[in-house]
Amino acid sequence: MPNIRLDVEYDGTSFAGWQRQPNGIVTVQGEIEAVLSEILQEKINLAAAGRTDRGVHARGQVVNFSTRSPLEHSRIRHSLNCLLPSSICIPSSQLVPDDFHARFSALERQYRYFAIPEPSALMGRYTGCSHGDVDFALMQHLSSGLRGTHDFSLFSREDRDGNGSLCTVREAGWYRHKGVMVFHIAANRFLRSMVRGIVGGMLSAGRGELDPEEYLGMLGGGGGGMRVKPAVASGLFLWRVRY
């Protein structure tokens, strides 16, 4: 059976996260699978590179599925874009080898978090808020300490997979773009709510509410769950997946 890869963009505001849920709860996976099953006249199960939380967006989610249908992947993509809600878009599709798996074949995931200093009715859908000025240089310093392999259990919610809490971060840093603070991070894997925990802790340190050494010390792990207030979901984007 053909193995088809879809690249997916979505505005996560109105969805209860990526992962399919029971009892009619609206999720991104559930919406795409329902439309695909209608188009292909068979039950479709998507594998995804990342399972984003409620309210988190994606610019570069990757999924794959197998189908018995003879339809070309480009026609499937066109039909999806006609039938899916406007908050979900499939910008590209391709046939991939049988052993390609959106999650397990991924080498690296990249996320970006966008934050503004004050609340905004216009930008708030796609940004978080620092609620005042922050020590930007300090946050840049803290982000450099994230690189390497660390135990991120104190920056994340309980692990659902039982695969441990060690993650290897290749790059992490802050930059400014047109008045918006942007945090970028790339790692081999991410724990549940990990990026929001990392950003929330850095914003707290930038406001002087959390000691920087305490923040860096939490990279040693220790269990007990998230020790920081996570940044709001609206500013977070799954940006790219590298294979």
Swiss-Prot record:
EC number: 5.4.99.12
Subunit structure: Homodimer.
Gene Ontology BP terms: tRNA pseudouridine synthesis
Known function: Formation of pseudouridine at positions 38, 39 and 40 in the anticodon stem and loop of transfer RNAs.
Similarity comment: Belongs to the tRNA pseudouridine synthase TruA family.
Catalytic function, reaction form: uridine(38/39/40) in tRNA = pseudouridine(38/39/40) in tRNA
Name of one Pfam family that matches: PseudoU_synth_1
GO molecular function: RNA binding; tRNA pseudouridine(38-40) synthase activity
Residues of the active site: 53 (nucleophile)
Keywords: Isomerase, tRNA processing
InterPro entries reported for this sequence: PsdUridine_synth_cat_dom_sf, PsdUridine_synth_TruA, PsdUridine_synth_TruA_a/b_dom, PsdUridine_synth_TruA_C, TruA/RsuA/RluB/E/F_N
Gene (name only): truA
UniProt source species: Chlorobium phaeovibrioides (strain DSM 265 / 1930) (Prosthecochloris vibrioformis (strain DSM 265))
Binding site for substrate: 111
CDD domains xrefs: PseudoU_synth_EcTruA
Name used for this protein in its record: tRNA pseudouridine synthase A
